[in-house]
Design a protein with these regions (language model features):
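Central regulatory/effector-binding core of bacterial HTH transcription factors
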Residues: 1-8
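Bacterial carbohydrate/catabolite-sensing allosteric modules
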Residues: 10-24, 28-167
Length: 167
């Protein structure tokens, strides 16, 4: 199986599939006719946003690694999240804080995603202290968010709610 095959090695994936069975997990590429298992990331983003909206959150931040074509599921999840806030007329109240593209030069790992949450939350809270919730694209980012908030003496969930997903 291949998890998140990027454009740069699609030819290799295609050659490999000629010799052995290959299943792509997430990031199915339309150019390849291979089996794939995909998560509906747009729906996941909408569900996350709907939960926050149902709890009364209006001013939220969304922290994500780079929204590049290499990891299109990130963009789908983010778009779904924003669409749900847009339906309520609150899209302008969502701050999307995106890591720089240098993060995607290597292979993303637990530490790099944690750092994205931690560092971008520190930046964010210097700029926007009136947020009611901060969302991490995934749980490792959410853990970084939590640690940054604790360090800044915010009480979670009393002062700010935090959400992540993906286990």
């Amino acid at each position: 199986y291949m998890c998140n095959p990027s454009e740069c090695f699609m030819d290799m994936v295609e050659r490999l599939a000629e010799r052995i069975p290959v299943v792509i997990i997430n990031n199915q590429n339309e150019k390849l006719s291979l089996d794939a298992v995909e998560l509906d990331n747009s729906k996941l983003g909408r569900l996350m946003a709907r939960h926050l909206l149902d709890l009364g959150h209006k001013k939220v931040a969304y922290i994500t690694p780079p929204l590049t074509t290499r990891q299109k599921q990130r963009s789908k999840r983010t778009e779904g999240f924003l669409k749900e806030f847009e339906k309520e007329g609150l899209k302008s109240q969502v701050i999307v804080k995106e890591a720089g593209e240098q993060m995607d030069i290597g292979v993303a790992n637990v530490d790099s995603e944690y750092r994205v949450g931690y560092e971008l939350t520190k930046e964010l809270m210097e700029e926007e202290a009136d947020l009611t919730a901060i969302v991490g694209l995934n749980d490792m980012i959410a853990l970084g968010i939590l640690d940054a908030l604790y360090e800044l003496k915010y009480r979670v969930p009393h002062d700010v709610s935090v959400m992540g997903c993906d286990n």
